[in-house]
Design a protein with these regions (language model features):
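A short, glycine/Asx- and small/polar-enriched loop/turn
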Residues: 294-299
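Generic C-terminus detector
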Residues: 301, 305-307, 311-320
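Nucleotidyltransferase catalytic core that binds NTPs
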Residues: 2-277, 283-291, 317-318
Length: 320
């Protein structure tokens, strides 16, 4: 049996709040299952003691935010939304090796657990699930039964450049859903194709979890918040704003009545004329199926991926 533990940390809430938050840390699947089995009764006992039951509700609404850690304001916005919509909030921190190709950055992906835990405690997160790779893939990631999304979602855009990515995402998300058993899960729209894969997963496989997409959180200069922004040097960080400028140009041309080909060509040229960019794709797609569009027709999404030096960035603009 894997040597695991369950621990907890207590953090005083931010200034202006009287709440003292107790964030529990669970590292093993066995402890998570035990927590999930008793969550309803413990929550109801606490609510009755505080005389705060919600219209006779006898079980908590559990919200779930799956992450790979290295948390930033974009992640915290997901937690904030979960806190507003749910009674109990669970955040997982697991850098999933199954979604990284051999040449990708699994080994150097930022791991900042202590800081992540501090942020989550301040946000009032109830539980952090922090498993090891051995807990999630006891026989190894190459021996697990995998979930492979259908080709239209799996093989285009991100999938064309990261062919194993969505298989890894879908597999670990389904496993986490089965373990946490949330009522609702929150994903950022910044990873738009991933969001559509997860929505298709729960719809096609009848997984009883509501999926909520939360709009992209941006820096003041428009750069989408991402854990990989930490890889950018000072000059690259300044240049990185060009990606959102390119997307915004497509949206501006769409609003002016231009067609997709002209708009994407102009935006692609903008990036090619800037220093250090290698454009991988810039496309206009249907908002749900991600089928490529030749004319702007709502709902649509403008999606792009490009490398700035050695750092790969993705972004999008959603037009509902």
């Amino acid at each position: 049996m894997t040597d695991t533990k369950t621990s907890a940390t207590t953090s005083t809430a931010p200034a202006g709040s009287k709440e003292t938050v107790r964030t529990q840390i669970i590292e093993s699947l066995a402890d998570l299952r035990a927590w999930r089995a008793q969550t309803g009764s413990l929550w109801l006992k606490g609510q009755k003691a505080a005389k705060e039951t919600r219209g006779g509700a006898d079980s908590p609404r559990i919200g779930f935010v799956p992450t790979m850690g290295a948390l930033h304001q974009g992640h915290l916005e997901l937690v904030k939304r979960a806190k507003a919509d749910c009674d109990v909030v669970v955040v997982s921190i697991f850098v999933n090796p199954f979604q990284f190709a051999p040449h990708e950055d699994f080994g150097k992906y930022p791991r900042t657990f202590e800081n992540d835990l501090k942020l989550l405690s301040e946000m009032g997160c109830d539980l952090v699930f922090y498993p090891s790779e051995k807990e999630i893939y006891p026989r190894g990631k190459d021996s697990i039964m995998a979930v492979v999304p259908p080709s239209p979602l799996n093989d285009t855009l991100e999938g064309a450049f990261r062919p194993t990515f969505f298989r890894g995402v879908a597999t670990v998300v389904l496993k986490l859903f089965n373990l946490v058993q949330p009522h609702v899960a929150f994903f950022g729209e910044k990873d738009y194709q991933q969001l559509q894969v997860v929505k298709a997963l729960v719809e096609d496989l009848d997984v009883p979890v509501e999926i909520v997409g939360v709009p992209t959180v941006r820096e003041s200069d428009g750069l989408a918040m991402s854990s990989r922004n930490a890889y950018l040097g000072a000059a690259e960080r300044t240049e990185a704003t060009s990606l959102y400028k390119a997307l915004s140009l497509v949206k501006t041309m769409a609003d002016a009545g231009k067609d997709v080909a002209d708009a994407t060509a102009a935006a692609s040229l903008l990036l090619k004329e800037e220093k250090g960019w290698t454009l991988q794709y810039l496309s206009v797609c249907h908002g749900k199926s991600l089928a490529p569009l030749t004319q702007f027709q709502k709902p649509y999404v403008i999606v792009t991926a490009a490398k700035l030096g050695e750092v790969r960035l993705i972004d999008n603009i959603v037009v509902p």
